């Protein structure tokens, strides 16, 4: 069944989606929980459970840590189509100090066609969109005289799982990681639809829809720098703050380009769609020549896109925290640097650590001890095959001028846990943005917002993907 076979009122469905999203934003599911909102994730999970129960469904809710809730529902197909499709989302949001917001971050204001609030794009908008698809499928079952909690949904050959987790923003220990150990059936599927992909980005007048098929791995390190304590009136070369500054200077230099298969495909597909001049730039970047790429990158896209693209072409090292010194006239003998590294597929933790030492050089490295804080493997899914092809075709059907293409994202999501279960997981939260809008400007940003028009476009796209993959 496709959209052309239905009489769904998508405007009415979008109105309900918008109200669900606004309700969810008003639940301050902040991670880490605050004294003012200690149980926001649990309240968000209960909201979804209550909404699903109102549609005649029987959701499950778990609370592995007090105040941290995850929720799940399974809609049944007739069992002839193989393993399920997983619609995966998270309920938690990062903090949102309100001082610079023009609309309070948890008021869910609707202004000028946009819904404002923390979580509008990361990722309660997708939660509400997935919820709308589930409610639509349940309504179709009821219209056929069936019980959606028990009977197969008309036209579905696979089950559809809808799982919303806690704790994604802090690593997932109280969310997806717990589910892998205790409720793996909530995640086990033939494929998963996740956040951070299929949101349009306009380059050289072309609307691209990058579908996330890979995520960089991550390694955080604590670098302990040893110097000699002394009096500030007698400067010395082994001042730990000075040594730390030198370390940071060396680590901050960009790594060399290393093209992965996903990014080679991304650049090739982009070049095929771009006007001639921009296409030449894309091919120049794909050549892997560092000097050429650095000079030409911003000829392909604006600075916002260039920052992202640079990160996807290399391993990255970002010194983000430094502590040194106790008083202005005391030379510090110790300093601490915390470094965020994001690694391409093929880079191991030991290789990243060795690279830090190499970048420091032997003299500085001798003054440093490197401790691993956290490590996560890169994640990859096939950039071809049934689910990817269905997602790409759904975008083309709803935006004939749009260009879907595979991409890697620079950050980590709950896909790192579904990958442990062998579930190919894709960044696919379809939204059609205006030409000057960028998704990553909104993630964790001030005045986070999403337009009603973008949601109205994305809802039938997601519904089509579910129907086509599961039908």
Describe these PLM feature segments:
Residues 375, 401-470:
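Zn-dependent metallopeptidase/amidohydrolase metal-coordination segment
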Residues 98-101, 152-155, 211-218, 311, ...:
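Short glycine/proline-enriched loop/turn "hinge" motifs that connect secondary-structure elements
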Residues 2-119, 143-158:
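Acidic/His- and Gly-rich active-site-bordering loop/insert found
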Residues 248-257, 277-282, 291-294, 382-432:
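Active-site-adjacent substrate-binding region
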Residues 327-360, 376, 380-395:
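C-terminal substrate/ligand-recognition segments
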Residues 115, 121-210:
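Acidic/histidine-rich catalytic neighborhood of metal-dependent amide-processing enzymes
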Residues 111-122, 404-405, 446:
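Short pre-catalytic strand/loop immediately N-terminal to key active-site residues, enriched for Gly-Thr
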Residues 184-191, 197-206, 211-220, 232-322, ...:
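Acidic-enriched catalytic cores of C-N bond-cleaving enzymes acting on peptides and small amides
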């Amino acid at each position: 069944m496709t959209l052309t076979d239905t009489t769904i009122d998508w405007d009415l469905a979008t109105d309900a989606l918008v109200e669900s999203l606004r309700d969810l934003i008003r639940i301050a599911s902040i991670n880490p929980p605050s004294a003012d909102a200690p149980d926001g994730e649990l309240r968000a999970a209960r909201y979804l459970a209550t909404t699903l129960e109102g549609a005649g469904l029987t959701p499950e809710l778990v609370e592995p840590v007090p105040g941290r809730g995850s929720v799940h529902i399974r809609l049944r197909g007739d069992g002839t189509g193989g393993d399920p499709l997983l619609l995966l989302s998270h309920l938690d949001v990062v903090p949102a100090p309100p001082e610079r917001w023009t609309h309070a971050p948890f008021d869910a204001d609707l202004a000028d066609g946009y819904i404002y609030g923390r979580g509008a794009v990361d990722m309660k908008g997708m939660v509400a969109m997935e919820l709308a698809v589930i409610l639509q499928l349940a309504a179709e079952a009821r219209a056929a005289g069936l019980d959606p909690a028990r009977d197969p949904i008309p036209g579905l050959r696979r089950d559809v799982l809808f799982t919303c987790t806690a704790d994604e923003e802090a690593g997932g220990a109280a969310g997806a990681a717990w589910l892998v150990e205790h409720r793996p059936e909530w995640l086990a599927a033939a494929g998963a639809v996740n956040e951070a992909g299929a949101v349009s980005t306009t380059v050289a007048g072309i609307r691209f829809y990058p579908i996330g098929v890979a995520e960089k791995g991550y390694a955080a390190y604590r670098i302990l720098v040893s110097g000699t304590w002394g009096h500030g009136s007698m400067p010395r070369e082994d001042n730990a703050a000075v040594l730390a500054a030198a370390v940071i200077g060396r680590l901050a230099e960009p790594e060399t380009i290393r093209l992965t298969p996903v990014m080679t495909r991304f650049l090739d597909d982009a070049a095929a769609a771009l006007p001639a001049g921009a296409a030449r730039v894309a091919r120049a970047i794909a050549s892997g020549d560092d000097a050429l790429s650095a000079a030409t990158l911003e000829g392909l896209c604006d600075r916002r896109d260039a920052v992202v693209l640079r990160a996807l072409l290399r391993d990255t090292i970002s010194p983000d925290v430094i502590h040194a010194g106790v008083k202005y006239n005391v030379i510090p003998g110790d300093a601490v640097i915390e470094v965020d590294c994001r690694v391409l597929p093929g880079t191991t933790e030991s290789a990243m650590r060795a690279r830090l030492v190499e970048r420091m050089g032997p003299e500085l490295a001798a003054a440093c001890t490197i401790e691993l804080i956290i490590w996560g493997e890169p994640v990859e899914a096939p950039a071809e095959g049934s689910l990817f092809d269905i997602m790409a075709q759904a975008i083309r059907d709803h935006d004939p001028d749009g260009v879907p293409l595979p991409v890697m994202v620079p950050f980590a999501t709950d896909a790192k846990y579904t990958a442990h279960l062998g579930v190919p997981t894709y960044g696919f939260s379809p939204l059609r943005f205006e030409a000057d809008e960028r998704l990553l400007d909104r993630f964790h940003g001030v005045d986070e917002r999403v337009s009603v028009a973008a949601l109205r476009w994305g809802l039938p796209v997601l519904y089509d993907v579910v129907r086509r993959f599961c039908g």
